[in-house]
């Protein structure tokens, strides 16, 4: 079966935003206008197509990123048919892992901002993730019909907070309840959408007289940005010649794909205005798989290479999401970077070193599915029947093995003990937790060796709450959850030049002998653990050096202060001795572990605690209370901003340990009128009194 859509007509995009910017509603309109949905699903009534988990429909927030395929021929039916694969990503900070893994497989993104709230903290997080994967972007300012909507303020915030280079390709006609439509700065026409047809019909009209001057001014900036794409256009522009509509669009596309500009538009998805033009911009300005660089990868021996987006190349794909479907079982979502794969083909997973046969291939539309026979370069689809693949792993042709770059997932910052309510729950709970951990790499499960309790860890209270809720709904497991615990870390502050570890056992028969000398140094935050082999002259034989490292790495799991994981240390093995008969791997492993523990004691060990970036939006009357409360929680105030229409945003860095139950406290402080967001920022040394309290609690 031949490819239906040429690859240059593909657009793999994400729709990303802060919670409440109206992203899911925007996606719903996209599905409506592209003809997938005949009735618009509203988030308000829990009927949105992309939000298909029960909890998402109840809470009105998007948790998992559903992938959907749609087709678009242009607002005026003026394009050849384009295939748009959309990944809907969550906007809540507890689910940044979902955003991260979808950014990895996208070619472009639409950033949705609220015209009232503007650039909010999660918008900055998503922006950083898009920068990391160099994803070209459009900005869509939504909710232009809301009180306090201000398109130009969002433009200023994008420059200031995101250090972006937004270029307006539209300006709004009116705002708040008077928002009527937009001025298309390329065509220099006003666009009005017909409300009776839910925005499926529109008209081009003359620009209102009062907006003429503003439109000319913003068009001039846009044309100048377009002219900067090449010397040829710049000469034409400086010579006073008019650039054609085609030249402007081609130049804006070139600069968008190069990540030099962010074309900016506006509308109100809820009132059916603007999303149609945003879809046109996706086709006209965002890249196809052919417009982005070939994907970097490695051969089995580590040699760097690339794979082009071409059906003739050998098959390679990246698994970016695992989901359990109630009807077909485990689904692996993947992005095809090169080649073709048919259902029934055998593929190879180089990370696991295993071959697997692909069962069925499915094209997903939110939670509906269509069975397909094959997938091509550029496709995003789901496979059934792969037992071993997990998120971030490569799937490739067994005869042409490559490894695509691995994804790096954040370490959890919060833990809770979870206990089954009944004996039957006990058996099901292990299975349920393992299944959930397989789907979500930022969720970890372990058993506490001392208490025997099951400990779950994740990115925030809401993250864990939703996973426990899924356990109940999807697996029928009732569980009680303990108090949240902070994921502290331990490190050192001093250099220790010479620490000896000697493990000697001389009893009858064969003894044990391992002797090492280490140097320990603190590393800069976030650098992790590093082991350096500086042995000269074979004083520790080559074959025992990995055992020394293994002994140290095992010790890292439990620090000497309160048993928390140890981070950011460099250990250099530079001397030691061995015994011809009694030395073995185990003896050197023990010696490495002993030396490291001793060195930790001598190198000024400290406890590190996770610090959170907290932003509180509050009416001005309560600002003093909010700031006082944050300070009492050991918060460090970072600044304040005004909210249009009154109110303030207070920004602070606060230890996670002080933020449990904050939503209840904030509600009572502000009569329920303030909201907040919080995300992990970095680890910082805990004050002495806090460290002592944590150590005392652990010692009980």
Swiss-Prot record:
Catalyzes the GTP-dependent ribosomal translocation step during translation elongation. During this step, the ribosome changes from the pre-translocational (PRE) to the post-translocational (POST) state as the newly formed A-site-bound peptidyl-tRNA and P-site-bound deacylated tRNA move to the P and E sites, respectively. Catalyzes the coordinated movement of the two tRNA molecules, the mRNA and conformational changes in the ribosome. InterPro entries: EFG_II, EFG_III, EFG_III/V, EFG_IV, EFG_V, EFG_V-like, EFTu-like_2, G_TR_CS. Gene3D superfamilies: 3.30.230.10, 3.30.70.240, Elongation Factor G (Translational Gtpase), domain 3 (3.30.70.870), P-loop containing nucleotide triphosphate hydrolases (3.40.50.300), Translation factors (2.40.30.10). GO terms for molecular function: GTP binding; GTPase activity; guanosine tetraphosphate binding; translation elongation factor activity. It is found in: Cytoplasm. The gene is fusA. Pfam families: EFG_C, EFG_III, EFG_IV, GTP_EFTU, GTP_EFTU_D2. Keywords: Cytoplasm, Elongation factor, GTP-binding, Nucleotide-binding, Protein biosynthesis. Belongs to the TRAFAC class translation factor GTPase superfamily. Classic translation factor GTPase family. EF-G/EF-2 subfamily. SUPFAM superfamilies: EF-G C-terminal domain-like, P-loop containing nucleoside triphosphate hydrolases, Ribosomal protein S5 domain 2-like, Translation proteins. It comes from Polynucleobacter asymbioticus (strain DSM 18221 / CIP 109841 / QLW-P1DMWA-1). One of its GO terms (cellular component) is cytoplasm. Residues 8-290 form the tr-type G domain. This is Elongation factor G. PANTHER family: RIBOSOME-RELEASING FACTOR 2, MITOCHONDRIAL (PTHR43261:SF1), TRANSLATION ELONGATION FACTOR G-RELATED (PTHR43261). GTP binds at residues 17-24, 88-92, 142-145. GO terms for biological process: ribosome disassembly. Disulfide bonds: none annotated. Its main location: cytoplasm. Coiled coil: none annotated.
């Amino acid at each position: 079966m031949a490819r239906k859509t040429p690859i240059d007509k593909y657009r793999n995009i994400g729709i990303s935003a802060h919670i409440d910017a109206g992203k899911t509603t925007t996606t719903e309109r996209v599905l409506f206008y592209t003809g997938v949905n005949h009735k618009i699903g509203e988030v308000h009534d829990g009927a949105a197509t992309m939000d298909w988990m029960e909890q998402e429909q109840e809470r009105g927030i998007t948790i998992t990123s559903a992938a959907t395929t749609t087709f678009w021929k242009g607002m005026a039916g003026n394009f050849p048919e384009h295939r748009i694969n959309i990944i809907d990503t969550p906007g809540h900070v507890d689910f940044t892992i979902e955003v991260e893994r979808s950014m990895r497989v996208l070619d472009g993104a639409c950033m949705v901002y609220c015209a009232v709230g503007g650039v909010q903290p999660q918008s900055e997080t998503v922006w950083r993730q898009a920068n990391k994967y160099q994803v070209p972007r459009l900005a869509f300012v939504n909710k232009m019909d809301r009180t306090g909507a201000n398109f130009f303020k969002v433009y200023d915030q994008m420059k200031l907070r995101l250090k972006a280079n937004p270029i307006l390709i539209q300006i709004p006609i009116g705002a708040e309840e008077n928002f009527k439509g937009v001025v298309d700065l390329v065509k220099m026409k006003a666009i009005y959408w017909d409300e009776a047809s839910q925005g499926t019909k529109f008209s081009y009209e003359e620009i209102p007289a009062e907006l003429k001057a503003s439109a000319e001014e913003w068009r001039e900036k846009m044309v100048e940005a377009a002219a900067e794409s090449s010397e040829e256009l710049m000469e034409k522009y400086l010579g006073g010649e008019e650039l054609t509509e085609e030249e402007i669009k081609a130049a804006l596309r070139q600069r968008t794909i190069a990540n030099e500009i962010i074309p900016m538009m506006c509308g109100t998805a809820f009132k059916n205005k603007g999303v149609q033009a945003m879809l046109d911009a996706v086709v006209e300005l965002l890249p196809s798989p052919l417009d982005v660089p070939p994907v970097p990868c490695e051969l089995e021996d580590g040699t760097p290479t690339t794979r082009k987006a071409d059906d003739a190349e050998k098959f390679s794909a990246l698994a970016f999401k695992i989901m359990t479907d109630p009807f077909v079982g485990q689904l692996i979502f993947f992005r095809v970077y090169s080649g073709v794969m048919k259902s029934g083909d055998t593929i190879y997973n180089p990370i696991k070193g295993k071959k697997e046969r692909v069962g069925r291939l499915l094209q997903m539309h939110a939670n509906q599915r269509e069975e397909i026979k094959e997938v091509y370069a550029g496709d995003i689809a789901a496979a059934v029947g792969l037992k071993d693949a997990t998120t971030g792993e490569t799937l490739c042709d067994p005869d042409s093995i490559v490894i695509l770059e691995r994804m790096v997932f954040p370490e959890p910052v919060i833990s809770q003990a979870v206990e089954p309510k009944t004996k039957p729950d006990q058996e099901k709970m292990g299975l349920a937790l393992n299944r959930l951990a397989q789907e979500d790499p930022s969720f970890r499960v372990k058993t506490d060796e001392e208490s025997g309790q099951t400990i779950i860890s994740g990115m925030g209270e809401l993250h864990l709450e939703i996973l426990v809720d899924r356990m109940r709904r999807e697996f029928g497991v009732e569980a009680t959850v303990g108090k949240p615990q902070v994921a502290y870390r331990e490190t050192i502050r001093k250099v220790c030049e010479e620490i000896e570890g000697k493990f000697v056992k001389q009893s009858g028969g064969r003894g044990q002998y391992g002797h090492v000398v280490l140097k320990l140094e603190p590393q800069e935050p976030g650098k992790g653990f590093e082991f350096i082999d500086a042995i000269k002259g074979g004083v520790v034989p080559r074959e025992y050096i990995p055992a020394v490292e293994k002994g140290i790495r095992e010790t890292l799991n439990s620090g000497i202060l309160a048993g928390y994981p140890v981070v950011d240390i460099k250990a250099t093995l530079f001397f030691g001795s061995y015994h011809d008969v009694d030395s073995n791997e185990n003896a050197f492993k023990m010696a490495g572990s002993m030396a490291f523990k001793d060195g930790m004691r001598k190198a000024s060990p400290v406890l590190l605690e996770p610090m959170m970036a907290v932003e509180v939006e509050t009416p001005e009357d309560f600002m003093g209370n909010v700031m006082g409360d944050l300070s009492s929680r050991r918060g460090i105030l970072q600044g304040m901003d005004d909210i249009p229409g009154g109110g303030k945003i207070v920004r602070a860095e606060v230890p996670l340990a002080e933020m449990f139950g904050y939503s209840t406290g904030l509600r009572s402080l502000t009569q329920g009128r303030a909201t907040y967001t919080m995300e992990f920022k970095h680890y910082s040394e805990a004050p002495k009194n806090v460290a002592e309290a944590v150590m005392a609690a652990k010692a009980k």
